[in-house]
Amino acid sequence: MVLVKMALGFLILLSPLCAMELDISQTDIIERSLNFLLFVGILWYFLAKKLRSFLHAKSLEISKHLDEIQAQLKASKENKKKLLKELEQAKEKAELIVSDANKEAYTITQKYELQTKIDVENLIKNSKALMDLEVKKIKRELVESVFKDLRESKKVSFSTQDCVNILKQRL
């Protein structure tokens, strides 16, 4: 239908040329134009359905491919949202773990500081007690040594009661 309208339009445009006097050179172009139009019309008549079906198939193929790409794009966007959500959850979990680790480290530090303080105090008490015992032991040995020397020298005489009193006062 469109082809027929085009052919008629072309003929109407060429009609002024037909009314004029023609010489041989002008008729050749008209014949060639008419032959071309007939050739195009015949091609259109035989190939129009095949061309339409081919173009329709290509259109469907492109549409199908576009739908697949859009589905992939949608899946990619959903996957991106899911991964971003997982990333946020991982960040929150990491912050929670770091916070818990800091609290636990502080608790452990406090515990060991307290235990160390108690251990140091116990060591100081034990060392003072040991020093006191050693001082008493040394005093006792010194007093015994002095009394032993004094008894053996026999320059000074002590009664037993005097020795006991001296030992009680010094120890």
From Swiss-Prot:
Subcellular location: Cell inner membrane
Membrane topology according to the record: Single-pass membrane protein
GO cellular component terms attached to this protein's record: plasma membrane; proton-transporting ATP synthase complex
Keyword field contains Ion transport: yes
Database matches in Pfam families: ATP-synt_B (PF00430)
UniProt keyword Oxidoreductase, yes or no: no
Keywords recorded for this protein, A-Z: ATP synthesis, Cell inner membrane, Cell membrane, CF(0), Hydrogen ion transport, Ion transport, Membrane, Transmembrane, Transmembrane helix, Transport
Family assignment from sequence similarity: Belongs to the ATPase B chain family.
Name recorded for this polypeptide: ATP synthase subunit b
UniProt source species: Helicobacter acinonychis (strain Sheeba)
Source lineage: Bacteria, Pseudomonadati, Campylobacterota, Epsilonproteobacteria, Campylobacterales
